[in-house]
Swiss-Prot record:
Its EC number is 1.6.5.2. It comes from Rhodopseudomonas palustris (strain BisA53). NAD(+) binds at Y12. This is NAD(P)H dehydrogenase (quinone). Its cofactor is FMN. It catalyses: a quinone + NADH + H(+) = a quinol + NAD(+); a quinone + NADPH + H(+) = a quinol + NADP(+).
Amino acid sequence: MAKVLVLYYSAYGHIETMAQAVAEGARAAGATVDIKRVPELVPAEVAKASHYKLDQAAPVASIDDLANYDAIIVGTGTRFGRMASQMANFLDQAGGLWAKGALHGKVGGAFTSTATQHGGQETTLFSIITNLLHFGMVVVGLNYGFAGQMTLDEVTGGSPYGATTITGGDGSRQPSANELAGARYQGQVIAETAIKLHG
């Protein structure tokens, strides 16, 4: 049975919610799934004053965890069109795994959130995907089998490069039903690919 890691960073809970949906999709495909988050780098008093969501249940990952999975699906909110520094800092520690080829052939994917439709969703996804390709991973996006990314009936996230959500400038918008469906679909397709490649 394929083992899938949903690895995320979420300051305000939007990506945490998306991570849970990604995991649901991967489980529906028959994979064993763990959800873990990367360490917070912001000092506790600053995070509290900034109203970060500090009660997230997912355990904190270690870099060596990555080698234990057949698929790794990475999610983080955007920071100026790229992944958050917390996720970048974590992935930057994977040099030892990269040098050993420990991640070659694993399946990977990315998901993100932005405040606005044009807040850098695709560039953020590319910033994650670039890392996965350097690690030697097989990248799977959100293919057009998920018709929800084609809708014009609502403001919605989603791209062939990965599932996304739009939070609104003040963060009050939560992931929509369509965005969560896209996250589940991507999780399922990545898990199905991992099962085909790794059993």
